[in-house]
Every structure is written in C-alpha cells, then in structure tokens.
Amino acid sequence: MKIKNSLKALKARHRDNQLVRRKGRVYIINKTAPRYKARQG
C-alpha cells in the first residue's frame, strides 16, 4: 500500500479506484487491481 499526501492524482490512474473514508483516514481501494491501494497520510 502506498502512502501519499494527496490521492487525487492516484485516483485517476485506474477507472475502478474508489475513494473511501475509514476511521478518519482516506483510502483508495481497487477490487480488480489491488496494486492501486493507497492511504493518505
């Protein structure tokens, strides 16, 4: 999982990326291509 300051550019890298908020953190999840997982931090 990548940890980035800004997820906006990462979200555009794959069309199945979803932006979700869990426990006060922002994540990108991708069920079809899990290598795009990322967390903002």
From Swiss-Prot:
Gene Ontology molecular function terms on file: structural constituent of ribosome
Gene Ontology cellular component annotations, sorted alphabetically: ribonucleoprotein complex; ribosome
InterPro entries registered for this protein in UniProt: Ribosomal_bL36 (IPR000473), Ribosomal_bL36_sp (IPR035977), Ribosomal_L36_bact (IPR047621)
Keyword presence, Repeat: no
Biological process per Gene Ontology, one example term: translation
Entry superkingdom: Bacteria
Pfam family, one: Ribosomal_L36
Keywords assigned: Ribonucleoprotein, Ribosomal protein
Keyword Ribonucleoprotein found: yes
Stored HAMAP family: Ribosomal_bL36
Family: Belongs to the bacterial ribosomal protein bL36 family.
Protein name: Large ribosomal subunit protein bL36
Species in which this protein is naturally found: Mesorhizobium japonicum (strain LMG 29417 / CECT 9101 / MAFF 303099)
